[in-house]
Amino acid sequence: MVTIERTSDIDTIKSIVIHNDIYPFISDDYSPLATDYEPIIDDSIYWLLIKNSGVLCGLFMIHQSNGITCELHTCVLPECRGSKTTLYTKKLFDWIFENTQFKKVITHVPSFNSAALVLAEKSGMKRE
């Protein structure tokens, strides 16, 4: 069973975000080195753990883009990727619409990250 759980545990967040198979895909030229990364903990930022049958599979981070729109960032651990990844995003969308004021979810996908683009499209997101 897939669950989504809000967290403010800095160590857990950091361990996922700076993972060698995640950080290079979510950082940019102005990001700190992974060893210097510190997550921002604030009520306006939702750090959401993904668990599958109790096993930690990664996290989603959402933050407000405007009054009804949130921006999504996805960090799925390599051992949990594959066919179940779309289940994680669908569960996330349910969580967002049940627990926040947001009515729309957006994400930005760099051109080099084809796996993220496939996940977004399989999860029902559309290009705008």
Where are these regions (language model features)?
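Conserved catalytic-core motifs of GNAT/GCN5-like acyltransferases
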Residues: H108, K126-E128
